[in-house]
Amino acid sequence: MSELKIKAAKAAIAYIEDDMVIGVGTGSTVNFFIKELAAIKHKIEACVASSKATEALLRAEGIPVIDLNSVQDLPIYVDGADEVNERGEMIKGGGGALTREKIVANVATQFICIVDESKVVKRLGEFPVAVEVIPMARSFVARQIVKLGGDPEYREGFVTDNGNIILDVFNLNFSTPMALEDSLNVIPGVVENGVFAKRLADKVLVASASGVNNLK
C-alpha cells in the first residue's frame, strides 16, 4: 500500500511550478508528498500547512511554512481522502484535520486529491464522517446527528488543532452529499464536517499497480 501512496505523491509533483505557494494537506499519503516536495524545495516559495502535524513535517524537511492569512493567492492544494468518487466528492477527516483542510482547500485555485485505488468508491458513506464539535456541545450535537439518521461515536482522547473534539458518524444518508454537508454544519456547536461535496477535488490522482490515473 505504501508503494501506491508513493506513486500518487510523485504524480502530484508534476503539478508544482517554480515559485509556487503550495497548500499541503494531512495524512499518510500527504506525508509521502512532503518527502517528494523536499527534493524540489529550492524551486518553491513556501507551503501553507493544514495541520500542526503537517507543519512539523514540512519544517523538518527544511521547507518554508507561511500562515494562510499572509497569502492572497494559493494556486494549488494537495491532500488525500478517506473516500472519493468520480465526481471528486470526498469524505475526509480521518486524521482530524478536516476544518483546516476545508479552509485551505477553499482558498486554493486547484485541489489535487492523491489516493491509492482502495479509496475510490461509487457511493460515499462506508467510511465514517468526522464532525468537529465545540466540547460543551458534544451531547447536544450527538443527539441532533441521531435525528439525521447517523450513529455518532466520540473519538476518545483526541483534541483537534483548534481545541475541539471529534464525533465520528456512521450510517449517514449520502443520497445528496451537498445537502448532508449543509445539514451537519447548521447544527449549533458543529465547527465543520468531513463531507467535501461543495469544494470538490479538481483532479483525483489514483495510484494502482498499473500506474496513476486521473479520475477527473
Swiss-Prot record:
UniProt xrefs under SUPFAM superfamilies: D-ribose-5-phosphate isomerase (RpiA), lid domain (SSF75445), NagB/RpiA/CoA transferase-like (SSF100950)
The protein's assembly and partners: Homodimer.
GO molecular function, one term: ribose-5-phosphate isomerase activity
PANTHER family: RIBOSE-5-PHOSPHATE ISOMERASE
Pathway(s): Carbohydrate degradation; pentose phosphate pathway; D-ribose 5-phosphate from D-ribulose 5-phosphate (non-oxidative stage): step 1/1
GO cellular component, one term: cytosol
Gene3D superfamilies reported in the protein's UniProt record: 3.30.70.260, 3.40.50.1360
TM segment ranges: none
InterPro entries reported in the protein's UniProt record: NagB/RpiA_transferase-like (IPR037171), Ribose5P_isomerase_typA_subgr (IPR020672), Ribose5P_isomerase_type_A (IPR004788)
EC primary class: isomerase
The protein, known as: Ribose-5-phosphate isomerase A
Family, as annotated: Belongs to the ribose 5-phosphate isomerase family.
Function as written in the Swiss-Prot or TrEMBL entry: Catalyzes the reversible conversion of ribose-5-phosphate to ribulose 5-phosphate.
Pfam families given in the database record: Rib_5-P_isom_A
Keyword tags: Isomerase
Organism domain of life: Bacteria
